[in-house]
């Protein structure tokens, strides 16, 4: 009964995370298949948890930071790490992976549906691009999360030594790149070994749309709490990425019209 209560409390405390998680599972099931997206989720969670566990103790890979424990008893913790924090890496990783696949792979259109033709599931280009896109999400997220006391997130963590990027350490972004690399590399290797991949992948746009919707949410919070300078930098990152994505989709539309 206690486990049920804490799970319910976690959902009520982090409804936006569960909403993104649900949308991620739907999008991922359509694009990768249910088996692959579940494997992706498990891989991402365990890699993320290990990275957070070690960083809060020895500062690797993100640099040293600490969870405040403010939400202890209100949400599920695994050791000193909030369960939902590590779990969020799964959908942030997939959103980045899906956008990287869209940018790199050939795109075809059938009516209103866009699909990837011969997706670059295992390419190094997708691996590194995903990791970069993964970091760029955190460039928007972390400065706002660090100011969680000013919105409904709460002050859930802090850096003992204030970082150069609006309080966030540069080692944090390096850590996100390495963890993103580890998640996608592990998934690519396992996916290839098990032979689960598909020659075509439908639902090519839902993952990228969710990538940008998450950014819109973070941008909204950034401006809501009055961090306009951070917001303008984040908005420029968002704008550059969405323009690149729109150009790729327009190219697919023009090819299908010929």
Which ranges hold each PLM region?
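Aromatic-rich, lipid-facing transmembrane alpha helices and their immediate juxtamembrane interface loops
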Residues: 1-258
């Amino acid at each position: 009964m206690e486990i049920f209560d804490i799970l319910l409390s976690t959902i009520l405390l982090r409804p936006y995370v569960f909403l993104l998680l649900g949308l991620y599972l739907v999008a991922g099931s359509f694009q990768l298949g249910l088996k692959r997206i579940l494997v992706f989720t498990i891989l991402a969670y365990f890699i993320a948890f290990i990275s957070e566990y070690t960083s809060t103790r020895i500062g690797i890979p993100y640099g040293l930071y600490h969870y405040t424990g403010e939400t202890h008893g209100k949400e599920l913790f695994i050791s000193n790490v909030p369960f939902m924090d590590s779990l969020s890496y799964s959908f942030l990783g997939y959103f980045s992976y899906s956008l990287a696949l869209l940018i790199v792979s050939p795109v075809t259109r059938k009516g209103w549906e866009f699909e990837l033709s011969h997706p670059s599931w295992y390419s190094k280009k997708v691996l590194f691009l995903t990791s970069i896109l993964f970091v760029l999400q955190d460039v928007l997220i972390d400065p706002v999360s660090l100011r969680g006391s000013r919105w409904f997130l709460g002050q859930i963590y802090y850096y003992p030594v204030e970082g150069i990027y609006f309080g966030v350490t540069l080692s944090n972004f390096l850590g996100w790149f390495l963890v993103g690399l580890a998640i996608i590399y592990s998934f690519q290797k396992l996916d290839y070994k098990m032979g689960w991949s598909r020659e075509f992948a439908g639902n090519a746009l839902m993952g990228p749309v969710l990538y940008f919707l998450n950014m819109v949410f973070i941008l909204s919070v950034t401006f809501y709490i009055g961090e306009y300078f951070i917001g303008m930098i984040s908005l420029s990152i968002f704008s550059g990425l969405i323009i690149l994505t729109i150009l790729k989709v327009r190219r697919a539309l023009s090819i299908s019209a010929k």
